[in-house]
Amino acid sequence: MTISTPVIIDSLIRHAQRTPEQTALLCGDQHWNYRQLVTRAHVMASALRQAGLSGQAILLNLPKSLDAVAAIYATWLSGNHYIPIDYSQPSSRIERIIAAAAPALIIDTAWLATLDSQPSFDAEQPVGRMVYHNPIAAILYTSGSTGTPKGVQISHEMLGFFIQWAVRDTQLTARDVLSNHASFAFDLSTFDLFASAYVGAATWIIRESEQKDCAALAQGLQRHAVSVWYSVPSILAMLEKSTLLNPTLGQSLRQVIFAGEPYPVTALKRLLPCLPQPCRVSNWYGPTETNVCVAYAIDRARLAMLKQVPIGLPLEGLTAQLEDENGDRHPLTAQLRLSGELLISGPCVTPGYSNVVVPRQAALHPHQCHATGDWVEMTPEGLVFRGRIDDMVKINGYRVELGEIESVLHQHPAIDRAALCVELGDLRQTLIMVISLQTGAVPPGLLELKQFLQQKLPSYMIPNKLVITESLPVNANGKVDRKQLAGVVAV
């Protein structure tokens, strides 16, 4: 299915015309209805058009706010695309992204102040549809292997395909209230913002200061009667550990979705009793280059039999293949235990990168195919993530998938989170376990953990060192930061 019209912006404007008083956004003590949101976006778009900007990259260096959302739509209404910046990240990385992106304009708080001081931009501008020419909706910057952030182009076709699938999968309606926990620079935010705009629902924008504040999250969840929650697993685990989340507080929840990293089965089992019984729980998978491309609905009854939460099966309309160690590609079939790098084809795939050349991807993307770099295995429950190809190391001549060891470690009752790193020696590499503990748990020793792992893994996959830390370092998206992990080990 090819989507040639900007379905999201058309839907947004339609809601502003038909249900102008419907709540669109909630943030702190502020809220906007759909007319207010579209009117503000038009004011910004008028300024961009008067500046002669069309088909350009507009960088958004703003904290999460109502204005930040309006700025996103303003870039589309003026025929441009947006580049969101995670406002909480170090200034040095922001500078690297700005240098790599070379935007035509930066919208920041100073730009907004100037805009508001100019009476020529009428706040009561009529709501209407703008002519649309730019096929690119956004450029999202992710970490690059060279140290230079990598700009992933997000097309309107990609967004339209994903949002229409997500709305069907979650049975989203205008009565829903979605939570937006992710930074606007993270691809998870595209569901929160654009699925709600597509159906006319409301979105609670969780500000940077609230993102790791369990009390603020619990209060907002209840206050706004959030019905659809979407975040990385570590945030859900944090809420569960706080003991603030329970079926009564979260009684409005009907969908809880996690993505971005594996959710250990043991941790997920602890989360489920905190949710209302009818609440559907899903695992969505996909790199920025495809957004969500594989999904799995959690079966509470079957969860007890699983060692790892599957990522599931490709979305309808997409094709998945597994490329084995020999470079041979295999279609997904009923053949179990087939493993390889996951390749995804279809309208969800990025057109390419904005500022770098990734040789293998550059060859695949024109054919709407993306090599994810993730090693997966086909099981009766669907695809299971086994680890990043980048995280596969050779130990004594054996290929070792760090993710497989981490998955087993997460089954230990004392462990909250676990990650592996490799210490390079003159003659050999040493595997090191880095773990954080469950509240009140007795710290396990190295021997105990080695014996635990030996029950499920071959001897060459057993780490020889252990580091226990209060918490594992995470990046801005809530995922374990492996570069910082090496620093924890070195201390």
UniProtKB/Swiss-Prot annotation:
Give the matching InterPro entries.
AMP-bd_C (IPR025110), AMP-bd_C_sf (IPR045851), AMP-binding_CS (IPR020845), AMP-dep_synth/lig_dom (IPR000873), ANL_N_sf (IPR042099)
Q: Is Nucleotide-binding a UniProt keyword of this protein?
A: yes
Q: What is this protein called?
A: L-proline--[L-prolyl-carrier protein] ligase
Q: Name one Pfam family in it.
A: AMP-binding
Q: Which GO terms describe its cellular component?
A: cytoplasm
Gene Ontology BP, a term: secondary metabolite biosynthetic process
Q: What class of enzyme is it?
A: ligase
Give the gene name: pigI
- After gene disruption, what is the outcome? Cells lacking this gene show a white phenotype and produce 2-methyl-3-n-amyl-pyrrole (MAP).
Organism ancestry: Bacteria, Pseudomonadati, Pseudomonadota, Gammaproteobacteria, Enterobacterales
Q: Which family does it belong to?
A: Belongs to the ATP-dependent AMP-binding enzyme family.
EC number(s): the record gives 6.2.1.53
